[in-house]
Amino acid sequence: MARGPGLAPPPLRLPLLLLVLAAVTGHTAAQDNCTCPTNKMTVCSPDGPGGRCQCRALGSGMAVDCSTLTSKCLLLKARMSAPKNARTLVRPSEHALVDNDGLYDPDCDPEGRFKARQCNQTSVCWCVNSVGVRRTDKGDLSLRCDELVRTHHILIDLRHRPTAGAFNHSDLDAELRRLFRERYRLHPKFVAAVHYEQPTIQIELRQNTSQKAAGDVDIGDAAYYFERDIKGESLFQGRGGLDLRVRGEPLQVERTLIYYLDEIPPKFSMKRLTAGLIAVIVVVVVALVAGMAVLVITNRRKSGKYKKVEIKELGELRKEPSL
């Protein structure tokens, strides 16, 4: 029996229903996948324009661009504010320091960069460079830091664990350049050189103000991500630990030192001499004085012995009978 025209379903109802279901499913999936792949120390939610995923750094609450590396200043602030019971977040050990002064709670500007003056939420202040490392003596709140001095040269000094033989320098160079290009998205031109003398590896990163274009990853941020990877505290979301291999052979790093060179030399006074350095100087001076004293005493003893021998010989000559 033929149906009446009022009973026939509209031909577009089913496709429209499928589109609605697909949209809802896609939106739910987007919410489930709302994470920041380049920074796990973020809080993400689909509250951006059009319901897009938006991530904000812990501590500062600033929105971050998850298509590139997060600035080191925002990362340090996030590490300082991370709750102790947050198992999914990086909590640095007491010995995981970025410089000799250790970890501190930095002040960041609206672009996520370090402010030139840092006080660690106290009345003690100092000036830092673009990577947040102290470059002056510490002072009080009256201390002035006129500009944020850029770090244009970073030397990463590594020591790898003993291996059966030395790595091929060319293969090692190529692997480390690939790592910085693919994992840290640093333009190859900023990896100036890779040096190798078993077991020491040195990676030189160079980037001055005129070379860095909009969108370029900063060498300070790349070096910091690399440092955290090496120490087993990766900042990337959902990625495994760093697995470095050269021609299939694992490259295991056991020591990392990072040196920073600024465009303007740092300003430290003699107060920067540490107790250890002063102790070394004192030991050297004492050793020199002791050595000189021993030398003088030895010379005097030798001189006195010669005089006694001469006097004895003269006495014997006087006792001999004359012919």
Curated annotation (Swiss-Prot):
Record note on modification: The N-terminus is blocked.
Transmembrane feature ranges: 275-297
Entry keyword Protein biosynthesis: no
Disulphide bond pairs: C73-C108, C119-C125, C127-C145
UniProt entry tagged with the keyword Transmembrane helix: yes
Glycan-linked positions: N33, N120, N168, N208
Protein family (similarity comment): Belongs to the EPCAM family.
Protein name, UniProt field: Tumor-associated calcium signal transducer 2
Protein origin, superkingdom: Eukaryota
One biological process term in Gene Ontology: negative regulation of substrate adhesion-dependent cell spreading
Species per Swiss-Prot/TrEMBL record: Homo sapiens
Native organism taxonomy: Eukaryota, Metazoa, Chordata, Craniata, Vertebrata
Alphabetized SMART domains for the sequence: TY
One annotated Gene Ontology cellular component of this protein: nucleus
Role of this protein: May function as a growth factor receptor.
Subcellular location(s) per record: Membrane
Residue ranges that the UniProt entry lists as topological domain Extracellular: 27-274
